[in-house]
Amino acid sequence: MILARDDKWTLGSIALIFVLLIGFALLFLLERFRVKEKSRTFKDCVNVYQCPSKGERVYLALRHWFIFLATHKAQMTLILSPLVMLVTIPFTGKETKNSIASYDWNLTGVAARLGYLSCGLFFVSYFFSLKNNPFCLMLFSSHEKMNYLHRWLSVYAVLISVLHGILFMIFSAQSYKPLLYDKISIYGYFITVVLFLMTVASLPSVRRKFFEWFFVLHHTCSVLIIFLIWLHHPRTIVYMKACIIIYAFDRGCRLFRSIWNRSNFRIYLLNEDMIYMVGRKPKRSFFALPWAAGSHVYINIPSLSYWQVHPFTLASAPFDDFIELFVAVHSGFTERLANRLYSMPHEYPNFSLAPGTPESLSNTYRELNSFKSYAVEIENTAQGHTYEPEDLYLETTVFMDGPYGTTSNVFKEYSYVLLIAGGVGFSYTLPILRDLILKECNVTSITFIWSCRSLSLLKVASKSLNSLLHQSNVRLKIINHFTGSISCKESSEFSNQTTENSEMEFFDDRPDLDMYIQKFFDYVGYQTAALAACGSQSFLKRIKNSVNKSISSTTDIYQHYEEL
């Protein structure tokens, strides 16, 4: 299909979006170079604090505003929405010749142009939903960060398409055109119904509560939209072909990776609300993407369901010969997996390490192999029973798509790093910590804060943290806050430790985030710093509020938040 003259405006809007992103990617590369050079200079000249110049102060102030908006999506949406609408106005094409009704104020011309524009935005929205997105590689970021663009471009596309339909209905009513049995109108009504279903299913409250239903409905409606718009008008076919090509390419790559990375996983139930999984590292292939610490994979367990795929954060790093996952048990897929573990009859297995097992095998896995020496008490008085994790294990085939995530560990470029996690969120911050300690970087000081209420999880993770404590060549402070119903200090395994330049502490209360973040900013001074946090929505909100209260205009800090 040859593009018509009017399509130039739609192509112009698509090009504008991509050009802006390419420009942003170039600025991001320049920022990384600036941070790397500043951190390298500081590392070579320890304890040399230079006050930022006037130009750097202005730059940091502008950067703070950008980071604030990037980490507060609601405020960014309020600012960007009217700007996007203003930019959209020129692309509606009021100068378009009205060949249908010359007496009209160009109503049909504007309505048609809005239809083309919405098709173009649907294509861009599909593009940013791809797991295999080239902009992720350019920005050293995860496809999850593109979801913001995917969602809001979809919203704008829906609003513009609805306006397109309303204008044509007004014209049809004025011109006494058929509204109910016209072919184009009928497909338009079907498109409206499907878009309404997608909008309702995509609401945050609905999406979180019924994620599995949302996943199925969202993808089904996405395919329906393509074919309905295809049938709606012949001039839209070229845009829908583009959507089909990129959608099929992405799905094909993911399917190939899932089959290629099929392997046996050993799955343990640490306690009533925590699952541990360990398996073979993903194979290298032409379709594999580069990944770094803090990445995630999509897991499918055929013995539970062939159709359900769920994302989980990797607690291992790229240089490991294995991958491990810590999974919190919620309703749905993870609950069924936990019930499967409960229902299986077990005898205590003798997990001797097979010949050729790498020495780098995780402390977690080795600790599980020796877990028989003690029992974990479930903190549930209604149950009142104890069990040992080895008695609740499963070995099964897993299809694994990924890993996906950042292509490099950006935290390596900063002088000071603060890692904060709540609960199973430590599976995101732990591999970053390991990567910073075991690999060469510009970091001179790391603070690791973790709040946890699971005693068994704390015991398993403390082995890895203790090992890192004695391997660290930089200043390392590990702070563990146990929020369970009993005291972790009753066990001799959770004792404070100090080495030449590192220390690890245990506390039986909630962390005072305001105090920790303020101390970190005071310690950083004018040098480069990075903060990474992972936890629940409320946990991250507390951290963001603490950062906003403590940050100054000269603080040179990068912030990254991962919501569980």
Curated annotation (Swiss-Prot):
Domain (FAD-binding FR-type) ranges: 254-410
Catalytic reaction list: 2 a Fe(II)-siderophore + NADP(+) + H(+) = 2 a Fe(III)-siderophore + NADPH
InterPro entries, sorted: Cyt_b245_heavy_chain (IPR000778), FAD-bd_8 (IPR013112), FAD-bd_FR_type (IPR017927), Fe3_Rdtase_TM_dom (IPR013130), Fe_red_NAD-bd_6 (IPR013121), Ferric/Cupric_Reductase (IPR051410), FNR_nucleotide-bd (IPR039261), Riboflavin_synthase-like_b-brl (IPR017938)
Single GO term (MF): iron ion binding
Sugar-bearing residue positions: N106, N261, N350, N442, N496, N548
Topology of the protein relative to the lipid bilayer: Multi-pass membrane protein
Domain Ferric oxidoreductase, residue spans: 114-229
SUPFAM superfamilies: Ferredoxin reductase-like, C-terminal NADP-linked domain, Riboflavin synthase domain-like
Sorted UniProt keywords: Cell membrane, Electron transport, Endoplasmic reticulum, FAD, Flavoprotein, Glycoprotein, Heme, Ion transport, Iron, Iron transport, Membrane, Metal-binding, NADP, Oxidoreductase, Transmembrane, Transmembrane helix, Transport
Binding site residues for NAD(+): L419, I420, A421, G422, G423, V424, G425, F426, S427
Residues bound to FAD: H310, P311, F312, T313, L314, A315, S316
Binding site for heme 1: H150, H218
PROSITE patterns in UniProt: FAD_FR
Cofactors demanded by this protein: FAD; heme
EC number(s) from the headed UniProt entry: 1.16.1.9
Electron transport recorded as keyword: yes
Compartments reported by the entry: Cell membrane; Endoplasmic reticulum membrane
Binding site for heme 2: H164, H232
Family per similarity comment: Belongs to the ferric reductase (FRE) family.
Protein name: Ferric/cupric reductase transmembrane component 2
Gene that produces this protein: frp2
